[in-house]
């Protein structure tokens, strides 16, 4: 029950906090639409630490930043726990992150109480397994403060071929 309340709260917070940005539509690409609130800086640092660990291939450090009940959405699929992610895509994600450089192009986020959201856009370019990669990326991460640390409770990744 508590888990459902936390997830519901996270979704409600994400939608509430993002509503002003979403309401503007694509024509309103203003500086305000890409603002990281000061309250979210430490949560964003956790997101950066997660990606840094993946790039180093340090899967233990990466998973230490995930809540046990993390939800990870990618490519139409979902992994419903840290253990499931560890046993399925973690190794491949680390391998890909090590091989293909990424560039953060835009970030926004807010934190309220024990919950935070970080939305990032970027571009990945390089070669992976002998094939060229050039993709625009979008990522939304929801975090929950546990004591003095942020834990990642939800990740949604998507990408599209760059034009």
Task: Place the predicted regions along the sequence by residue.
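Bacterial N-terminal signal peptides that target proteins for export
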Residues: 1-10
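A solvent-exposed, acidic/Ser-Thr-rich amphipathic alpha-helical stretch
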Residues: 59-111, 133
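Cleavable N-terminal signal peptides
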Residues: 10-11, 21
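A short, structured loop/turn motif at beta-sheet edges
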Residues: 109-116, 130-131, 143-151
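Short, low-complexity N-terminal intrinsically disordered segments enriched in polar/charged residues
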Residues: 2, 22-68, 84, 163
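Short beta-strand edge/turn micro-motifs at domain boundaries
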Residues: 24-26, 136-161
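Hydrophobic/aromatic beta-strand elements that line small-molecule binding cavities or substrate pockets
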Residues: 85, 103-109, 122-124, 138-144
């Amino acid at each position: 029950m508590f888990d459902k309340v936390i997830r519901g709260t996270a979704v409600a917070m994400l939608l509430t906090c993002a509503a002003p940005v979403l309401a503007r539509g694509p024509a309103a690409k203003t500086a305000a639409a890409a603002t990281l609130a000061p309250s979210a800086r430490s949560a964003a640092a956790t997101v950066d630490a997660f990606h840094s660990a993946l790039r180093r291939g340090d899967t233990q450090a990466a998973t230490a930043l995930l809540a046990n009940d993390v939800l990870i959405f990618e490519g139409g699929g979902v992994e419903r726990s840290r253990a499931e992610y560890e046993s399925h895509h973690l190794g491949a994600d680390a391998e890909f992150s090590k091989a293909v450089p990424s560039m953060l192009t835009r970030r926004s986020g807010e934190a309220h109480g024990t919950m935070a959201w970080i939305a990032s856009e970027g571009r990945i370019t390089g070669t992976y397994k002998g094939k060229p990669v050039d993709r625009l990326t979008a990522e939304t991460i929801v975090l929950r403060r546990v004591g003095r640390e942020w834990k990642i409770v939800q990740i949604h990744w998507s990408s599209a071929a760059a034009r």
